[in-house]
Amino acid sequence: MNLEALEEVKGFMPYHEGEALSKWAEEFSNKGPIMEIGTYCGKSSLFLSYGANKNNQLVFTVDHHNGSEEHQIDEEYFDNEIYDTETNSVNSFPLFVKNINRFRASNVVPIVRSSVDAAKTWNAYLGMVFIDGGHALETVSYTHLRAHETS
């Protein structure tokens, strides 16, 4: 995978942050798999995948793929490309899968659930947790608490 090519992937992560994230994933994936909370279209997942792959490690991505508050219709970051007209809702999962397949990131394992639901059943040790999910205070606080409890 060519990291520079990830600039083309839809997402909000600047290249320099993605490059740093990839280095952290490489460093901490020698202790266990990586978990990403909040996936959107997979840009950060791909940076994590690149780093974790150097240690033959998995990246678990947790996202309901219905978008955060700011991705909803009439909001600042609404995007028609991820809007499903059949269900009248945001659905970033098809574009996420397309991006993961395009870059052949076979070490990425999607968990299509809310972080709250996933946290209730997760009990495996992780080398690193990257949290960039919902930005509402309630979501951030709960997700951080559960990530800390299970690490």
Annotated model-derived regions:
Residues 19-101:
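SAM cofactor-binding core of SAM-dependent methyltransferases
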